Amino acid sequence: MSQTHKHAIPANIADRCLINPEQYETKYKQSINDPDTFWGEQGKILDWITPYQKVKNTSFAPGNVSIKWYEDGTLNLAANCLDRHLQENGDRTAIIWEGDDASQSKHISYRELHRDVCRFANTLLDLGIKKGDVVAIYMPMVPEAAVAMLACARIGAVHSVIFGGFSPEAIAGRIIDSSSRLVITADEGVRAGRSIPLKKNVDDALKNPNVTSVEHVIVLKRTGNDIDWQEGRDLWWRDLIEKASPEHQPEAMNAEDPLFILYTSGSTGKPKGVLHTTGGYLVYAATTFKYVFDYHPGDIYWCTADVGWVTGHSYLLYGPLACGATTLMFEGVPNWPTPARMCQVVDKHQVNILYTAPTAIRALMAEGDKAIEGTDRSSLRILGSVGEPINPEAWEWYWKKIGKEKCPVVDTWWQTETGGFMITPLPGAIELKAGSATRPFFGVQPALVDNEGHPQEGATEGNLVITDSWPGQARTLFGDHERFEQTYFSTFKNMYFSGDGARRDEDGYYWITGRVDDVLNVSGHRLGTAEIESALVAHPKIAEAAVVGIPHAIKGQAIYAYVTLNHGEEPSPELYAEVRNWVRKEIGPLATPDVLHWTDSLPKTRSGKIMRRILRKIAAGDTSNLGDTSTLADPGVVEKLLEEKQAIAMPS
């Protein structure tokens, strides 16, 4: 399919869309030319305790990066997601939970969710948790994860959700960095029929001598299997919630009070604790949810993301619940126990809006018609894609097979740091091109710049930057504002640098080309090459390592690691397995290298810098243009690496 082919806006969408093409142009112009008026109006999507007078107060200036929105307003996120819906829609389903086992599912109304959140808020207060304290949440995909997050927001505690796939070492690092006082977990998680030892991982993390801030661990009973128990520290969820009062008055929070920390991989060193605040974030999550998914009251919405990622925060929970929507939470995986599981869930719950990742789409695509076998999917109206650029072939398959050629695909580009959608179609306003994220959302001013920071006009390619602030933008990195400025605002002055490259076509549509820094995107999850390299080098037999990403049909990118062993050590199949398991234990299963390339030396400049550009090309099998190798200390290394590469079995 030609990249210039446009999919027209379907008549059934055009007839009742919230934003049509003319409205998009008008509103977008206003949002750029007069952000105070535009976002002042959009802020009314929420209920405020103290209405704001100021809207935007932001600076991207070097040495003075400061981001404030609605700074004199007060509100409570949980009240906006729950309390305000009770009078008219208290009996509406807030969360549909679909278990890993298809025989397990339940509907939780707004009234029931409100009661549970109030009880858990009182539980937190009884344990001495107060406004500003950090609570670590390491939970499976169960409604109690949402209860824990909303209860933190209700009392003004800051939540730090840790993805359930992370290792004890990764958990410990996040607890130490944020000084979390409490950990909320479950005995085990369940995924694709297998149990995940969540409590054991937390126990192991808390054995780290540098973890000194944690006072209690609240444990939800999910599987009921035996776990270790530390009397006094460990507390059962049910015991606490049963004796807690269902009455709780939400805390008035300033719009700029911290809401959550979410750790994301950086290209250097330890993961970064991205900090989002309350008001601007929720305005942005709710506004983007409403317009991008063309949400109408009564729609059943399903975002397949885990709560441990920003998508789970903004578009599984907070955006939908702020809008009074019914959101589906799925414990399992899209292709287990059958390739048609995702479509079976769509039919079972009559899902209207489906938001998933290219990785899932490609995995289902590989199954062919088995992915849709015996399913109807006629309830679907809007499809969405998130986590990484979607290749046109997968886009077309998704549109054709899952959506039966009648559902617009909103391919959303955004990041943990942006809080919400940045470049995305609006279903009733923008014609679609397979593989393009299309146009910017309201208030978002993207630009493409060359490596010197000069803006590139017209149809071109370059580094993707944003030239002015938006309400959902992260305010800082927890405890390290200097690193925040250094990471996002130092490469190009007075601009937010996304770390992604993009091209813009003759219609002004954006095509994301992927990371330009040393961050990998594996199955929609960001992993820093530095973090994986550090784990490899920590192995007693490894001298040096360099990690690059290679294209992978299902995961988007696979992890290719060049490894130099210590003098006297020899490669072996046993060591290969040992090293892969080592990384798995250090970081988590996601970071396990797909390929280990044993080598005696790496291509380095005379100053000792590893030439990653060359390593990327060799790993990808692209040897046509290795570029200038004259700066290498030993140009012969490249030939040797190419020879070694011939013998390596690549992942399919």
Curated annotation (Swiss-Prot):
CDD domains, alphabetically?
ACS
Q: Which UniProt keywords apply?
A: Acetylation, ATP-binding, Ligase, Magnesium, Metal-binding, Nucleotide-binding
Enzyme class label:
ligase
Top-level taxonomic group: Bacteria
How is the protein altered post-translationally, as described in the entry? Acetylated. Deacetylation by the SIR2-homolog deacetylase activates the enzyme.
Q: Name the coenzymes or cofactors required.
A: Mg(2+)
Name the Gene Ontology biological process terms: acetyl-CoA biosynthetic process from acetate; chemotaxis
The question of whether Nucleotidyltransferase is a record keyword is answered with no
Where, in this chain's numbering, is ATP bound?
387-389, 411-416, 500, 515, 526
One Gene Ontology cellular component annotation held by this UniProt entry: cytosol
List of residues that carry N6-acetyllysine: 609
| One GO MF term attached to the UniProt entry | acetate-CoA ligase activity
Matching entries from HAMAP family are given as: Ac_CoA_synth
Per the record, the similarity remark reads:
Belongs to the ATP-dependent AMP-binding enzyme family.
General function of this protein: Catalyzes the conversion of acetate into acetyl-CoA (AcCoA), an essential intermediate at the junction of anabolic and catabolic pathways. Acs undergoes a two-step reaction. In the first half reaction, Acs combines acetate with ATP to form acetyl-adenylate (AcAMP) intermediate. In the second half reaction, it can then transfer the acetyl group from AcAMP to the sulfhydryl group of CoA, forming the product AcCoA. Enables the cell to use acetate during aerobic growth to generate energy via the TCA cycle, and biosynthetic compounds via the glyoxylate shunt. Acetylates CheY, the response regulator involved in flagellar movement and chemotaxis.
List, alphabetically, the NCBIfam families matched.
Answer: Ac_CoA_lig_AcsA, PRK00174.1
Report the protein name in the record: Acetyl-coenzyme A synthetase
